[in-house]
Amino acid sequence: MLSIRFKHALLMGLMKSLAGLAPGMSHLAFTGPGSSRQLCRYVLDQGYTKILVASDKILRELGVTEAAIKELLDAGVEVAYFDDIEPNPTFEQVDAGKHVLKAAGSQVIVAVGGGSVIDCAKIMSGAATSDEDPKNWVGFGKVKHETIPLFAIPTTAGTGSEATAGAVITNVQDHAKVVISGSSLLPKAAAVDPALQQGLPPAITAATGMDALTHAIEAYICTWDRGTRKEHAQVAIKTVFNALPKIYADASDHDARAAMAMAAYHAGLAINQVNVGNVHAIAHQFGAYYGVPHGLANAVVLPYVLEFSKGPAEAALAELANLVGVGADASTQGAKAQAFIDAVKALNAALDIGTALDAIKREDHAAIAQAAVLEAVSYPVPRLMMPADVLAMLDAMTV
């Protein structure tokens, strides 16, 4: 126990020091319906003539990818595609994408897709200009070389990867999802275009929306007070509670869809200033072991971690209760904090997201708990998890 707490304290001190030395991150955002066209025109204005479009096969089959880059296609520039990116992308997919990029002689990457596509494209952008194994970049600030310019067009309202300087990649051999972060991985520009997200099925809308909520909550209750993370988190949290149930009930609600696209972006800006937390430390293991979609994993884990964190995070959770308009009759700060946690549970229920996952196997509990604890020590969490804490949550989440 002491070694885990000591390591956490050491890492938090080191990361705060590094944050003070880190260069400022420059990021341009185009927002609103049709903003993908603006981004493409911006790319063309930079003089790029050979472009790699990273996407996935489903988006290409649906015509979403081509719709997003219509301005590029109409301009007649040389476009190559890499669409072998799957949920929970792997280092093998990064390597395959790098080879496609090099063979095409592409000068820039335009990523069209959800968080998996954008994260994979981030590491591809670094791998294309380095002979080093990307597995050596796990952690913070290890991508020190110049990367291929990356532009992002998200097609889901969830990960906020278009606004972050980090990527999550699966190491298949180790059953591990690892985080690689550094300022050079932040997309040069992004287009938050809700028009590209209109056809999302309700289940994906729900899971990705809860992913955005998780990002915002973890940024809000973390112990590292930096920049405008609270302001961005507040915008995201209030918007998700208001807009997500509306889109889930009526996929044609364009105003709610546009609001959720911006909520995910604000949540991404929030975690980019601090980091994620215990929810992600556990949810990443579900993705690595079982391929559970990241948003769904976060949604299921979130209430358990909030209950676990309630003591030290009580004041912050009570503030969030006020933000979303729950717990007005609560007589204590603790009761108000509980009202917010209950509101998160109720939101999950309204979105038909359960409290357990069929995929989890009891024989994996010990390994998952150990991996989650080791990951969480690098996050500014309000309460540090021990293996027994994770095991208790896993037991409740296992069918």
Specify the residue positions occupied by each region the protein language model found.
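An N-terminal, well-structured beta->alpha segment
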Residues: 1-81
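Carboxylate- and glycine-rich phosphate/diphosphate-binding segment that chelates Mg2+/Mn2+
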Residues: 166-274, 388
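N-terminal small/polar loop signature for handling phosphorylated ligands or for N-terminal nucleophile
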Residues: 52, 60-132, 246-257
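Gly/Pro-rich interdomain helix-loop hinge
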Residues: 289-364
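Short, amphipathic C-terminal "tail helix"
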Residues: 363-399
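Glycine/threonine-rich beta-strand-loop-alpha-helix active-site module
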Residues: 92-195
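Glycine-rich phosphate/pyrophosphate-binding beta-alpha loops
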Residues: 158, 265-298, 375-380
